[in-house]
Amino acid sequence: MGAIGFDNQKYLTTQSEQIKKRIHQFGGKLYLEFGGKLFDDYHASRVLPGFEPDSKIRMLQQLKDDVEIVIAINAGDIEKNKMRGDLGITYDEDVLRLIDIFRDMGLYVGSVVLTRYNGQDAADAFLHRLKKLGIRCYRHYPIAGYPSDVAHIVSDEGLGKNDYIETSHSLIVVTAPGPGSGKMATCLSQLYHDHKRGIDAGYAKFETFPIWNLPLKHPVNLAYEAATADLDDVNMIDPFHLEAYGITTVNYNRDVEIFPVLNAIFEKIQGKSPYKSPTDMGVNMAGNCIVDDEVCRAASRMEILRRYYTAKTELVQGKGAEETVRKLELVMQQAGVTPEICPAVAAALDKAEATGAPAGAMVLPDGRVITGKTSGTLGAAAALLLNALKALGNIDDQFELISKQVLEPVCHLKTTYLDHRNPRLHTDEVLMTLAISALTNPLADLAKRQLPGLRDSEAHFSVIISEEDLKIFKRLGVRVSCEPKYETKRLYHR
């Protein structure tokens, strides 16, 4: 475990209390637009060491008697079979996955709303499927002039034509499988219909980043810009908050740009707006739970560097854009980030130069730097993994964890019978052979038991490593970056 910069227990307590206050402020009913990742928020855990990836869902569990989940999905995304790139499943399948997860955690899922519904065949099929599964579902329609034509939006022909979502709890959490799903529009539609029914209700927004009460150019906020460099999101000073209160806070450009329109919609629906600024709309308390600013600054700078290497790698792979790299270079300059902040970078490059072959290096949680080189039987990633396990287990480097009598037949199998060009073992293959060796070799067993100790290590490689290796390191909690070049000049890479 590395240094802690964030008090997670304090966050769970203060964040849930803040949401309760906002519910009370609006007379007992709040629509909370939940942005970002509800589960597995690894970005937050990387830049705020001590933040647990499941903190947000655990916080909601503390409020579970009050919580009702509404999941929004854009009907157009169903029609287009839009995919979640990180999971490899369509948005509609992800809705079902989310429902299962929420239910497993004891949270009540009230309904699913199909936004921008326009009679799409695939959307109708999904509605039918939901109904057969016993899930309540509603339809919201495209509104001409949204979001700027306030008079039309706040009318029976605008929000008024949407289905009213029946709810039974005081905290309605509106979430979605991805961006552009209509979460905010769903909340506004509900406010309109509740007001017509004489029901007091309010709206708030839950976004972890940017952290409103940290400086604009704080590395934690710059790391958010790095994470969204492929989008048009830019952190900025909230001018409305500054004008209303004389206090400098940070928000991102889309919320600042849409605020005058939202304000007008609130006024049209409820007679007056409850908010004077986009910052007012938020309920995020993460900034109040930072207990070591320097730890969070250092972690955020490392995150920015990783994002930069990822963008450069994706550019080589044909998946990225030059503009993204340029934005990240600017963020690096603002945060004072260079490759030298990660000792693994220089160590990997030095090892590669010394051996004339791909190499890697890893900074262990205790600060030790371990290297790994390419051999006849092991790729650089597999060699680095074994060397790191040896170091954690204090196993002398001269001892073999896996004998050549085991490694060489596996390499032969790959090239002779499985048509692999590369005989060297990847990390998943070397872990399987390590597990087998552990049955008869006590040192291999000792090394295998060190796997949990790899979490929060930083690794860098002199070339782009395989997807298989990346997946294994990710599962082990090792953060990886690569130089933006392939081992070979071949055009097709796996």
Which ranges hold each PLM region?
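Hydrophobic positions on the alpha1 helix immediately C-terminal to the Walker A/P-loop
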Residues: T186
